[in-house]
Regions:
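Residues at secondary-structure transition points
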Residues: 1-4, 36, 40
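Hydrophobic side chains within well-formed alpha-helices
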Residues: 2, 6, 56-57
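Short basic helix-loop element that most often maps to the first helix and adjoining turn
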Residues: 4-23, 48
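Conserved hydrophobic/aromatic packing and binding residues within compact polymer-binding modules
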Residues: 6, 20-21, 31-34, 60
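Short, charged recognition helix plus adjacent turn
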Residues: 12-13, 33, 61-67
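Recognition helix of helix-turn-helix/homeodomain-like DNA-binding domains
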Residues: 26-39
Length: 67
């Protein structure tokens, strides 16, 4: 699931939800919804996250296990 990968990547980089929300220019609450599966993640946000973590969108959305 997308939100599990997001949480794992964030924690692997020792970042808080607030850190990532600030980078994405969204509220921490909105990011929390993305990470818990409470909201769908817009493609623009997925692109920014893939760039930030230097990974592919396919990895983020579980289409591959290769980062």
């Amino acid at each position: 699931m997308v939100f599990v990968r997001l949480k794992n990547l964030r924690e692997d980089h020792y970042l808080s939800q607030s850190d990532i929300a600030k980078y994405l220019n969204i509220s921490q609450r909105t990011y929390s919804y993305y990470e818990t599966g409470g909201r769908d993640i817009p493609i623009q946000i997925l692109i920014k996250l893939a760039d930030y973590y230097n990974t592919s969108i396919d990895y983020l959305v579980n289409r591959t296990n290769s980062k």
